[in-house]
Amino acid sequence: MYEILFYRDQNDIEPVKEYLLSLAQNESKDSRIKLNKIRDYVKLLSELGTSVGKPYVKHLDGEIWELRPIRDRILFARLMDGRFVLLHQFMKKTQKTPKREIQTAQQRLSELKERLKNE
């Protein structure tokens, strides 16, 4: 079993967690479906790690992977201690994952590693 963490920035904001909370607060059927699907995918990641493979998980670049529920994408990485950190969320609108979304996840991962190193 793998531990799943939410990335938290210096202002104590957890972008992925906030997105999930916004889905939970929205009473639409579409939001409930998205939230349940994301929960299922995160559960699979916690149980099987990246070995769960496609269509659930896909390697993107370097240390960055993506969870692929419906059109939502949640970019994540595995930390040195084996835990996974959910870094960034976006809605997929194009065939290829936009570079800026991957760069956002990479920047957050670098910043997190720096903070962990200094603790």
Swiss-Prot record:
Q: Which Pfam families did the record assign?
A: Gp49
The record's section on InterPro entries has:
HigB-like (IPR009241)
Q: Which domain of life is it from?
A: Bacteria
What is the protein named?
Answer: Uncharacterized protein HI_0660
Organism phylogeny: Bacteria, Pseudomonadati, Pseudomonadota, Gammaproteobacteria, Pasteurellales
